[in-house]
């Protein structure tokens, strides 16, 4: 699925890898030319693992029911929360609890993995 017309975010909800396949996140990230790209890599029970390549900022949003886990592969990720900002370096992760207003941003090209419930639509709400 592509982003709606005029939306700067390229979001693909199709599951790229099936069970028993080697997941090659680096190959996908290296081939990415988008400033903001989100690809669902695989499904694990009721959750999905998504890879994002980002540069710039996302809009403020929250998920009313589900938590989100962010893990930085390369670059630096900033997660703005009400009242504070969390900065993540490579090999660091952070959980945003459901109901928490937040936005993600990166001042340089950054690759992250997200683990979240499969019901989350990664465009935020």
Q: What do the predicted segments below correspond to?
A:
Residues 1-50:
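A short, N-terminal "cap"/entry segment at the start of jelly-roll beta-barrel domains
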Residues 34-35, 48-64:
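Conserved short histidine dyad/triad with adjacent acidic residue
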Residues 45, 80-84, 107:
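Short strand-coil-strand connectors
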Residues 45, 73-74, 89-90, 108, ...:
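A cytosolic small-molecule/anion-sensing beta-strand core signal
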Residues 49, 58-60, 75-80, 120:
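Short beta-strand segments in beta-sandwich/barrel cores
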Residues 56, 65-78, 82-83:
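Glycine- and acidic-residue-biased ligand/ion/polar-headgroup-sensing regions
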Residues 82-98:
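Short acidic-glycine-tyrosine-enriched beta hairpin
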Residues 98-125:
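Ligand-binding loop in jelly-roll beta-barrel domains
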């Amino acid at each position: 699925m592509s982003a709606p017309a005029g939306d700067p975010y390229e979001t693909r909800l199709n599951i790229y890898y099936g069970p028993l396949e080697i997941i090659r996140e680096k190959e996908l990230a290296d081939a990415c030319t988008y400033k903001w790209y989100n690809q669902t890599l695989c499904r694990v029970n009721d959750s999905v693992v998504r890879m994002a390549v980002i540069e710039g900022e996302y809009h403020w949003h929250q998920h009313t029911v589900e938590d989100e886990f962010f893990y930085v592969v390369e670059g630096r990720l900033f997660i703005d929360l009400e009242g504070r900002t969390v900065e993540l370096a490579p090999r660091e992760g952070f959980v945003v609890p459901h109901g928490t207003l937040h936005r993600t941003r990166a001042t340089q090209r950054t690759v992250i993995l997200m683990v979240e419930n499969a019901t989350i639509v990664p465009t935020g709400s």
